């Protein structure tokens, strides 16, 4: 018998299909009197009518609440900066929201930097990433006064030094170290094992050599080390090994070069719930555990505990976002042993959410435009693109009376959907409201 998310058909009912799990949907999500989905007090049917579908809907209050939660939790854990990872979702409005709540912004391209600048975020609140920053991007960053640039290669040391010298400033930099730790995440988004394009090896000596080269350049000053161990992390175990190795690197740098590492940026990666069965750590619990891990590692190494910095992205904006689709076709397909899977085609797909096809990501979907008393049917929500892998939600229980014109809402699409969107098949990109 078919299941979805480990749920047997016998456990699915009309009532459970319409429920909105608090840890999956935005904090302001609720049902109206006719069963319609309400987001922040707004009827999604009205949004679809005014802005069309597909439509990205972002709950500002939810984003701000999560930004404050990270700011406060990590400050208590010893962080001097929490940088919002702009790659997850960026617009002028979102940049303003997170900055107004006390966060800096981590940008990874000239385009992201331009949006942050347009939003009025001061340079000192910005950190710039990227494994292949162009000279033009670096010059813009330095001239704007970006507070920190993360060094990702030997070539980049010379480029940043040249840009800073031309601008007549001393640029603060961090060295991104790969520490051979892989979080329990999908292979394509785990980024701390050694065989990868990011960073400089801690075990092979490249990170220490980068520090040595930076120290010789008058237009650069090293403020710290950076490490990022992956994405969708649900526990702090990976950080324990990573922190120990980065602290050991900091100790070697001090012992051999006399340079004290003042700041340790442990990146982002905190997971969110896409399904009811997902159970990510509370931000305060995660922050406290990581703070304790770093303090313990420093104490064991005999070095002062550096200031901490973090880069949450998905965990701030992901749960705040919902995508609305309109159903176009409903097609029952007979499978083996008489089982039926119903293919529900919507007016978007992999052009607005590539994550299902790219990572095998799972999502939660619900009927958003009305109430239904129909029995559950096993559905596969698919897009309208010319690809068999164009799947939005692989398996979901939806009402058996689903019909063209109904609205579906997919939860937790605030991160890496719009930012990775395309115009495949020349579909226009959805609006954001």
Predicted regions span which residues?
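Charged (often Lys/Glu-rich) extended helix/loop segments that serve as interaction or gating elements
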Residues: 11, 289, 295, 303-433
């Amino acid at each position: 018998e078919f299941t979805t998310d480990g749920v047997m058909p016998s456990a699915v009912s009309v009532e459970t299909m319409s429920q909105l799990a608090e840890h999956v949907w935005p904090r302001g999500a609720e049902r109206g009197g006719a069963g319609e989905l309400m987001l922040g007090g707004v009827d999604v049917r009205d949004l679809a009518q005014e802005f069309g579908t597909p439509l990205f809907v972002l709950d500002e209050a939810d984003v701000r609440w999560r930004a404050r939660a990270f700011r406060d939790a990590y400050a208590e854990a010893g962080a001097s900066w929490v940088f919002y990872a702009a790659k997850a979702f960026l617009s002028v409005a979102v940049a303003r929201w997170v900055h107004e709540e006390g966060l800096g912004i981590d940008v990874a391209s000239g385009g992201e930097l331009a949006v942050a600048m347009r939003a009025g975020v001061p340079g000192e609140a910005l950190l710039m990433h990227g494994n292949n920053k162009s000279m033009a991007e670096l010059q813009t960053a330095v001239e704007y006064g970006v507070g920190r640039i993360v060094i990702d290669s030997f070539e980049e040391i010379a480029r940043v030094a040249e840009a800073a010298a031309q601008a007549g400033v001393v640029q603060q930099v961090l060295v991104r170290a790969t520490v051979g730790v892989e979080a329990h995440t999908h292979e394509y988004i785990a980024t701390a094992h050694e065989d990868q394009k990011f960073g400089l090896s801690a075990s092979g000596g490249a990170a220490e050599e980068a520090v040595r080269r930076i120290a010789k350049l008058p237009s650069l000053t090293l403020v710290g080390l950076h490490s990022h161990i992956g994405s969708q992390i649900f526990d702090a175990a990976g950080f324990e090994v990573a922190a120990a190795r980065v602290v050991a690197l900091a100790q070697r740098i001090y012992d051999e070069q006399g340079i004290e590492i003042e700041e340790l940026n442990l990146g982002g990666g905190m997971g969110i719930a896409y399904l009811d069965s997902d159970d990510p750590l509370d931000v305060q619990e995660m922050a406290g555990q990581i703070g304790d891990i770093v303090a313990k590692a420093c104490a064991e190494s005999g070095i002062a505990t550096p200031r901490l910095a973090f880069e949450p992205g998905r965990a701030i904006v992901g749960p705040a976002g919902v995508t609305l689709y309109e159903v176009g076709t409903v097609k029952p397909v007979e499978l083996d042993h008489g089982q039926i899977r119903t293919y529900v085609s919507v007016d978007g797909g992999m052009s607005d959410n590539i994550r299902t096809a790219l990572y095998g990501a799972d999502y939660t979907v619900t009927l958003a435009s009305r109430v239904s008393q129909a029995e559950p049917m096993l559905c596969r929500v698919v897009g309208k693109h010319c690809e068999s892998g164009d799947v939005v939600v692989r398996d979901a229980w939806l009402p058996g009376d689903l019909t063209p014109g109904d609205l579906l809402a997919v939860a937790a699409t605030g991160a890496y959907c719009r930012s990775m969107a395309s115009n495949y098949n020349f579909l226009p990109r959805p609006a954001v409201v």
